[in-house]
Curated annotation (Swiss-Prot):
Superkingdom: Bacteria
Alphabetically ordered keywords of this record: ATP-binding, Cytoplasm, Nucleotide-binding, Nucleotidyltransferase, Transferase, tRNA processing
Homology family: Belongs to the SUA5 family. TsaC subfamily.
GO cellular component: cytoplasm
Keyword Nucleotidyltransferase: yes
Catalytic activities: L-threonine + hydrogencarbonate + ATP = L-threonylcarbamoyladenylate + diphosphate + H2O
Catalytic activity, EC: 2.7.7.87
Protein known as: Threonylcarbamoyl-AMP synthase
Residue span(s) of domain YrdC-like: 1-183
Organism: Haemophilus influenzae (strain PittGG)
GO molecular function: ATP binding; double-stranded RNA binding; L-threonylcarbamoyladenylate synthase; tRNA binding
InterPro entries in UniProt: DHBP_synth_RibB-like_a/b_dom, Sua5-like_dom, TC-AMP_synthase, TC-AMP_synthase_SUA5
Subcellular location, principal: cytoplasm
The keyword Transferase appears for this protein: yes
Length: 183
């Protein structure tokens, strides 16, 4: 499928697969509880774990992130360019849905400059949820055909290439810089 078709599917609260910096991600509209539920069911992922949001700029995260709790140094770190994709655990607004934050008062966000992510966010006007496109026990998908093999020929997949990163994103706490997952 092309970008417009995937954007339409996202607007219709479907779960889609799209390329990121290293692997294909599964994503949906983060403001749609029904879409997020479909995503969690598909991944067999407990809601308590929370989800990552990706977007090309901080503006897409404004509905979810409590920027008043982030100081200038932390903001610089959040906006920084790194050798590997980096996801940051940041303070969530009290209004951010629990189906996104899980059992936490924070949310995971990643600024992503992959052209596919940038285009989908700009076309739809919202950030995307991001979890690796793979079934439990299977390796993350790196090409569109692997996504179709795991999720079915009719699954909405953006037929574009992943970036050059070798590993999924590193995950760090923005306030403490604690490493949760090595990238």
């Amino acid at each position: 499928m092309n970008r417009e078709q995937i954007a339409d599917a996202l607007r219709q609260n479907q779960v889609v697969a799209y390329p990121t910096e290293a692997v294909f991600g599964l994503g949906c509209n983060p403001q749609s509880e029904s879409a997020v539920k479909k995503l969690l069911d598909l991944k067999q992922r407990p809601v308590e774990k929370g989800l990552i949001l990706v977007a090309p700029s901080l503006d897409f995260f404004r509905p979810f992130v409590d920027f008043e709790q982030i100081n200038d140094e932390q903001l610089s770190r959040l906006q920084g360019k790194y050798e590997r994709p980096t996801t940051w655990i940041v303070p969530a607004k009290s209004t951010t849905p629990h189906f996104l934050t899980g059992k936490f008062d924070s949310i995971a966000v990643r600024l992503c400059d992959h052209p596919s992510v940038k285009a989908l966010c700009e076309i739809t006007g919202f950030a995307l949820t991001s979890t690796s496109a793979n079934l439990t026990g299977e390796p993350p998908c790196r090409i569109a055909d692997e996504v179709r093999s795991q999720f079915g020929a009719d699954f909405p997949v953006l037929d574009e290439m992943v970036g050059r990163a070798h590993n999924p994103s590193e995950i760090r706490d923005l306030r403490t810089n604690q490493l949760f997952r090595q990238g």
